[in-house]
């Protein structure tokens, strides 16, 4: 191996390794952190939504006409509340009574609210049966994929679960933000790698040339 190649391997090799490690870090740690941030944002909005309903005194109950009430507050007519939350957070919210959607800010392609459809079996098992909070990266709202967070709703201070609150945000939009950040950092790392490789190449060439000159001088 020539002197120039040896010098290049010593200067450029660590740069390439560092760049690859940085890219791996971005694909794992950065993405994981962003997913945690999305989950926490959804969880916070779900808790705020639940608190907005729970502040009304009285039990959750179903009236003879099918409307769901919390004391004297008609949840089935709480359009202004869910729409205000959506406008303030950019997230859609849904109130489930049992496994049935009875109020939501989410609308279909015709602009109608997505109501009365049931939750999926896994969600029912996790939230309604086991009483767990549940985050999913694949919740479909009228064919549009969402990140979603589900939180059980209890009958006042009892252990009886009467339904759940859901908060979702468009998955494609969030992924675009995450991927954009990763691409930006990746591009910066690549530019830094190229610059360092250029400096290393120039340095290796200069050192190699000087060594050759020294050898020639010694031979003379």
Segments from the language model and where they lie:
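Short, hydrophobic beta-strand elements of compact beta-sandwich sensory domains
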Residues: 45, 147-175
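Extracytoplasmic/periplasmic sensor domains and loops in membrane signaling proteins
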Residues: 76-90, 105-141
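Short N-terminal helix-loop-first-beta-strand/juxtamembrane motif that initiates sensory/input modules
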Residues: 40, 44-56, 80-103, 132-133
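Core beta-strand residues in small-molecule sensory/regulatory alpha/beta domains
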Residues: 96, 124, 154-156
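Membrane-proximal alpha-helical signal-transduction linkers
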Residues: 40, 44-50, 206-220
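Membrane-interface helix-start motif
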Residues: 169-188
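Alpha-helical transmembrane segments of multipass membrane proteins
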Residues: 197-198
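Extreme N-terminal signal-anchor transmembrane helix of membrane signaling/transducer proteins, especially
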Residues: 1-29, 186-190, 194
């Amino acid at each position: 191996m020539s002197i120039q190649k040896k010098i290049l391997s010593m200067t450029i090799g660590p740069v390439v390794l560092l760049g690859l490690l940085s890219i791996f870090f971005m694909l794992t740690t950065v993405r994981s952190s962003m997913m945690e941030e999305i989950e926490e944002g959804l969880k916070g909005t779900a808790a705020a939504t639940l608190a907005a309903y729970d502040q009304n005194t009285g039990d959750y109950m179903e009236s003879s006409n099918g409307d769901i009430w919390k004391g004297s507050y008609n949840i089935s007519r709480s359009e202004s509340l869910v729409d205000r939350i959506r406008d303030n957070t950019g997230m859609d919210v849904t109130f489930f009574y049992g496994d049935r959607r009875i109020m939501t800010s989410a609308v279909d392609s015709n602009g109608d609210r997505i109501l009365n459809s049931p939750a999926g079996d896994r969600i029912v098992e996790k939230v309604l049966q086991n009483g767990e909070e549940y985050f999913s990266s694949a919740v479909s709202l009228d064919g549009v994929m969402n990140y979603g967070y589900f939180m059980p709703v209890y009958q006042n201070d009892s252990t009886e679960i009467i339904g759940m609150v859901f908060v979702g945000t468009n998955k494609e939009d969030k992924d675009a933000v995450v991927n954009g950040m990763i691409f930006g950092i990746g591009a910066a790392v690549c530019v830094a790698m190229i610059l360092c490789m250029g400096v290393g190449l120039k340095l290796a060439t200069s050192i190699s040339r000087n060594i050759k000159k020294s050898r020639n001088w010694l031979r003379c």
